[in-house]
């Protein structure tokens, strides 16, 4: 998924300023110039260091974190150990002059300050934008402090929550000189961005000039199903007495021993995959799937707790800063994203919106819902990778 970053550097300077990017264009592998052909490897290692653009260092960016109190009623309803997320935090990087502002929506379960929003922030800041980084509606901080129903996955609701956050950011930063508004998101954040842009067509608060969707899921159910299945991958060397984590840790240990030092970063991951200790396809698939399972567990746990559903945490169970949440998180780890949809999202959708079948829900939360808008709007630009693991049959044709 993350191997869009090299092309995003080009898009950052060009795409948002172009007049019309609605025409689809395939880029062959040779012209693309990306050296990793394995989609799992590209997802984990990201763009090789030598292909990354020169970007400003964090200390050279005028930036600051801010907080918003959007759900004051939850301040006393949430457990004490949720104190860090009773207010929604975001990051603003400002230019020293009037400039366009771009909102960046993080991917599945991601915090506003995670690695991809940080990368995109530097990219667009260097191009002259004010930049606002927002957490994903599926992150526990957003769910607790900004989401009305704390049950992410119904895209229209998620877009409404994001839109309210963006309006609150603009109100809080009323003295910031903004010439135009832009919007981008990656992975699930790109799907969110599409729905936010569509919402803005009727509410007209921002009149986004351009919207850039980076590697969006087309069919949300297909995407999460593909990722859920990765955790079931059969990996050589894993037995009842030797876990997947022990296999990966032993490989990393041998790698660092040969290197003579320990330094974990994106460049290291790329170099690691060029070494003899490199992860196999099965190990990489398991690693990606496991990461997604942790995100799904976070969503299931937080949604259940905020709404007092009692599926994971007993509704009246006393939780304070000293309470261990490990038993509940272990229970949440047994629930993949499809389980979360079945037990929490679909019941909420049916109760609140008189929803029907799973097929109806999938059509309402996926890009299919916006097909005419995406086709007709000249402001929407999409960048995707043909071998992205979140895509299913027919998805590229849709784009």
Give residue ranges: language-model regions.
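N-terminal cap/lid segment of alpha/beta-hydrolase-fold proteins
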Residues: 29-97
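Short, surface-exposed "cap/lid" segments of acyl-processing enzymes
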Residues: 93-140, 393
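Alpha/beta-hydrolase active-site loop
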Residues: 151-173
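Gly/Ala-rich beta-loop-alpha elbow adjacent to hydrolase catalytic centers
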Residues: 184-193
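Alpha/beta-hydrolase-fold enzymes
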Residues: 199-323
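Active-site nucleophile elbow and catalytic-triad environment of alpha/beta-hydrolase enzymes
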Residues: 351-372
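Conserved alpha/beta-hydrolase "acid-adjacent" motif
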Residues: 362, 389-395
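Short beta-strand/loop motif that positions the catalytic acidic residue
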Residues: 376, 382-384
């Amino acid at each position: 998924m993350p191997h869009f970053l090299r092309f995003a550097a080009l898009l950052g300077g060009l795409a948002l300023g172009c007049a019309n990017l609605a025409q689809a264009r395939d880029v062959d592998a040779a012209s693309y110039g990306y050296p990793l052909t394995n989609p799992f490897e590209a997802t984990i290692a990201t763009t090789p260091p030598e292909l990354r653009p020169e970007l400003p260092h964090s200390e050279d960016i005028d930036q600051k974190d801010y907080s918003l109190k959007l759900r004051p009623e939850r301040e006393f309803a949430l457990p004490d150990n949720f104190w860090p997320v009773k207010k929604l935090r975001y990051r603003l990087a400002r230019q020293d002059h009037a400039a366009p502002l771009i909102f960046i929506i993080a991917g599945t379960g991601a915090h506003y300050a995670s690695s991809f929003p940080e990368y995109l922030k530097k990219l667009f800041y260097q191009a002259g934008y004010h930049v606002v980084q927002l957490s994903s509606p599926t992150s526990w901080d957003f769910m607790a402090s900004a989401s009305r129903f704390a049950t992410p996955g119904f895209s229209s609701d998620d877009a409404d929550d994001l839109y309210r956050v963006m309006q609150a950011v603009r109100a809080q930063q009323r003295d910031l000189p903004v010439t135009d508004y832009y919007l981008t998101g990656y992975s699930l954040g790109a799907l969110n961005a599409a729905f936010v842009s569509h919402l803005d067509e009727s509410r007209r608060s921002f009149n986004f000039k351009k919207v850039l969707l980076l590697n969006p899921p087309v069919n949300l159910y297909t995407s999460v199903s593909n990722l859920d299945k990765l955790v079931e991958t059969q990996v050589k060397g894993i037995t009842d007495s030797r876990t997947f984590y022990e296999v990966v840790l032993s490989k990393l240990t041998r790698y660092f021993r040969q290197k003579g030092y320990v330094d974990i970063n994106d460049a290291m991951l790329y170099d690691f995959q060029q070494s003899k200790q490199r992860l196999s396809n099965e190990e990489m698939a398991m690693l990606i799937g496991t990461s997604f399972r942790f995100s799904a567990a976070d969503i299931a746990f937080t949604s259940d707790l905020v709404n007092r559903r009692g599926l994971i945490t007993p509704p009246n169970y006393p939780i304070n800063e000293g309470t261990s949440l490990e038993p509940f998180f272990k229970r949440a780890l047994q629930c993949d994203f499809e389980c979360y949809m079945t037990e929490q999202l679909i019941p909420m959708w049916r109760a609140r919106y008189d929803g029907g079948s799973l097929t109806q829900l999938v059509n309402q939360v996926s890009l299919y819902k916006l097909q005419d808008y995406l086709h007709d709007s000249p402001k929407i630009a999409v960048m995707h990778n043909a071998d992205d693991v979140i895509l299913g049959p027919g998805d590229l044709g849709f784009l």
